[in-house]
């Protein structure tokens, strides 16, 4: 199959919500060992995100049910649920291993621009994080270590190659902070990372281009939402973090929209 046909079929599969087929078509594009266009990168990301997202949602639901049945002492149901959860985890692992192989063998070695390098290392960090969400013992530690390494590699490039308001840099900070909070159980580091990204972007908000304004401000609001959630209890929050939510006003999105429309 040719390059253009693979891209077209990936778009068609997206419209039809047949994301497994979208993945297969974008793997053909990714295997060409060249730096993908922005559109191609996004198609690849959307394809895998939908495939993995459905399984992650299923895993959370089944895990919640398992915990409820365990609390009730329903051992026979718990046995069935554990087997079913394992099936979902096997699917999750297969998807993660698949995209990580594509990244390591094709996309990361072929990345030329700083934007591409950040994008791919961020995705690598994301999918190792997804593995760490359900893995246990040494496997969890290995996935967490690899996720941390990938996020750090992405951050190193982002800080020199991308402005603080760039949506990919902001998205990296968002996901990296979630990694600290959920995987490493390090809320202090999570808050500091998210706060720094938010503050750096706020300082340069007026220089943000119109085409990326919507994406960037949305991610900034997600950073703000996480900070609000993570610092919601003053009794549990280090005192040095509490001024954060009192200092910064909410983003004034409507005024910028009026200027853009005018």
Swiss-Prot record:
**Superkingdom of origin organism:** Eukaryota
Q: Looking at the Swiss-Prot or TrEMBL record, what is one Pfam family this protein matches? A: 14-3-3
Matches recorded under Gene3D superfamilies: 14-3-3 domain
Q: Which CDD domains match?
A: 14-3-3_fungi
Q: Which InterPro entries does this UniProt record tie to the protein? A: 14-3-3 (IPR000308), 14-3-3_CS (IPR023409), 14-3-3_dom_sf (IPR036815), 14-3-3_domain (IPR023410)
By its UniProt entry, which PROSITE patterns does this protein fall under? 1433_1, 1433_2
Q: Please report which protein family the annotation says this sequence is part of.
A: Belongs to the 14-3-3 family.
Query: What's this protein's name?
Result: 14-3-3 protein homolog
């Amino acid at each position: 199959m040719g390059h253009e046909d693979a891209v077209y079929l990936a778009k068609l599969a997206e419209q039809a919500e047949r994301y497994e087929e979208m993945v297969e078509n974008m793997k053909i594009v990714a295997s060409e060992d060249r730096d993908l266009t922005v559109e191609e990168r996004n198609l690849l990301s959307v394809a895998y995100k939908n495939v993995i997202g459905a399984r992650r949602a299923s895993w959370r639901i089944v895990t919640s049910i398992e915990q409820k049945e365990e609390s009730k002492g329903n051992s026979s149901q718990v046995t069935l649920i554990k087997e079913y959860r394992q099936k979902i985890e096997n699917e999750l692992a297969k998807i993660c291993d698949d995209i990580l192989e594509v990244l390591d063998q094709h996309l990361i070695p072929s990345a030329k621009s700083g934007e591409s390098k950040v994008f791919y290392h961020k995705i690598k960090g994301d999918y190792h994080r997804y593995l760490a969400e359900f893995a246990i013992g040494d496997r969890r530690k290995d996935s967490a270590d690899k996720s941390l390494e990938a996020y750090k590699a992405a951050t190193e490039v982002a800080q020199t190659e991308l402005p603080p308001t760039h949506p990919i840099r902001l998205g990296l900070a968002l996901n990296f902070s979630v990694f600290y909070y959920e995987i490493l159980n390090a809320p202090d580091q999570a808050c500091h990372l998210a706060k720094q990204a938010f503050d750096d972007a706020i300082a340069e908000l007026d220089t943000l281009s119109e085409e990326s304004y919507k994406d960037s401000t949305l991610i900034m609001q997600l950073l703000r939402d996480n900070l609000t959630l993570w610092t919601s209890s003053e009794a549990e929050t280090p005192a040095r973090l509490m001024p954060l939510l009192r200092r910064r006003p909410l983003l004034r999105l409507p005024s910028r929209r009026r200027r853009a429309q005018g």
